[in-house]
């Protein structure tokens, strides 16, 4: 009979840790990457510390590159302290483009989209994200840190409301409702492919991000505009590379698309490389051997006391 899997190569995972214990076999096939490409979201203090240790890529969101840049720099610095190449941590910023062949066409499209947007829906969305009931504040109440005293569900998002910028000089429920109804509080760029590409480059330059998590207003319309209008402009600028001709028939993993062909597994400087099956197995066996020796020593000692190693005389 043909075998789908060689049973001799299926290993049992035995783990006992602080938060959970298990003894089982993995239930899915290993991918060419072995460890999935590791995305993380959030730039709070706890999130930044976690990201600097574990994340290969981070979803970030901010209304301004000026506000985002220090957060990116902080995480890169933390990664360096942990022995990682800070540039190996990739940042993908939320970005919603509204595109037209011309700036005028894009503006007309944006005005039409706003006519369908629900500002109340935007407030409900943000209230759910942050745990703050924005409906209890007057529309033009300027939000401050004193208002951020409720259940903090998304701490890094909540922090945005206490940081202003040239793009958003003040945060009020009215401003939040307008921003959240299209773009979800991230940047919205309206214009021709050239204008939107200029804005993308500005974010890369000023915030030090590596890529973008493209938001949409309509589907599939927003994505069709990106493919048909924006991508050709980015390729003309040489900042959105095509797959090399010699590699077009090859399969690329998600990690290779970020780090380059050949980097299927975790980088050598990543924390996860310490956790390989053989290493874990050796550690577990060493711990079990140590426990057996301790038990043997205790059994050999009189009156149930633990045997002590005799000091050697010189």
What name fits each language-model region?
Residues 1-33, 69, 79-202, 234-298, ...:
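An alpha-helical appendage that flanks or caps ligand/catalytic pockets
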Residues 37, 47-57, 62-64, 71:
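Long, repeat-rich segments with strong aromatic
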Residues 40-50, 192-205:
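Short, acidic/polar
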Residues 69-77, 219-239:
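C-terminal helical cap(s) of enzyme catalytic domains, especially alpha/beta-barrels
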Residues 44, 64-65, 95-99, 218-220:
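Active-site-proximal loop/turn and secondary-structure-junction residues that shape catalytic pockets
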């Amino acid at each position: 009979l043909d075998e789908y899997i060689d049973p001799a190569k299926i290993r049992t995972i035995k783990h006992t840790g602080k938060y959970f214990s298990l003894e089982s076999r993995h239930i899915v096939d290993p991918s060419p990457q072995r460890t999935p490409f590791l995305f993380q979201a959030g730039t709070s203090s706890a999130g930044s510390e976690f990201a600097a240790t574990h994340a290969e890529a981070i979803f970030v969101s901010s209304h301004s590159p000026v506000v985002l840049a220090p957060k990116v720099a902080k995480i890169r610095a933390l990664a360096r302290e942990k022995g990682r190449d800070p540039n190996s941590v990739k940042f993908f910023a939320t970005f919603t483009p509204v595109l037209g062949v011309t700036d005028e066409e894009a503006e007309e499209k944006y005005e039409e989209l706003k006519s369908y947007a629900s500002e109340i829906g935007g407030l409900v969305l943000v209230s759910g994200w942050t745990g703050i009931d924005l409906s209890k504040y007057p529309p033009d109440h300027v939000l401050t840190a004193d208002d951020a005293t409720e259940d903090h569900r998304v701490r890094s998002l909540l922090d945005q409301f206490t940081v202003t910028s040239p793009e958003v000089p003040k945060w009020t429920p009215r401003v939040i409702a307008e921003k959240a109804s299209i773009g979800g509080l991230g940047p919205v760029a309206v214009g021709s492919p050239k204008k939107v590409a200029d804005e993308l480059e500005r974010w890369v330059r000023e915030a030090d991000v590596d890529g973008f998590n493209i938001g949409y207003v309509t589907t599939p319309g927003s994505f069709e505009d990106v493919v048909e209008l924006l991508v050709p402009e980015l390729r003309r600028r040489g900042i959105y590379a095509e797959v090399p001709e010699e590699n077009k028939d090859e399969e690329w993993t998600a990690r290779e698309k970020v780090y380059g062909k050949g980097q299927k597994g975790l980088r050598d400087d990543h924390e996860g490389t310490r956790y390989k099956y053989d290493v874990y197995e050796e550690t577990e066996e060493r711990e079990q051997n140590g426990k057996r020796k301790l038990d043997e020593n205790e059994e050999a000692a009189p009156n149930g006391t633990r045997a002590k190693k005799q000091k050697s005389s010189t």
